[in-house]
Amino acid sequence: MLVVDIGSWTVDLMPIINQSPDESVCVTKNSGIITCIQQINKECVRKLNSEVDEYDIQQVMLNGADDLPDQYKDIILEELHKYCETITNYIRELGYNMDLTPIIFVGGGATVMKRFGQMQQRNVRYIEDIRANAKGFDYLGKIYLERTIRRVG
């Protein structure tokens, strides 16, 4: 299983083996959602000579925001698809089979991957709760404590 945590500034790719994270092969990429927003605005400036408010970009990420002019919305959608392809390529580069490996996207970017990543196969799940990371570490901590108590006990 592979957990892909897409946060504000980073994307963490963490394999889970026997219900435990394998930190020896965990990879962090500096390609979080904020970098995606920055890239969208670079393209808007390049093509239209003006930026889009971060709030408007986030609204497109979350629900499509049909109230933006088409020329801006088209750039945003194109860049979101490119961003998702970049994340998918990270996973492939690490040697994971996108059709077979159970992949769980978590964090704020899980919604972006679900809406724009075009990955709807059965082995892919999306946990869109922005507190999922903290809840996951809490869960893993409890498993670790239970195992430690059993060994010592």
Task: Please identify what each model-predicted range represents.
Residues 20-28, 68-69:
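Short, flexible active-site loops
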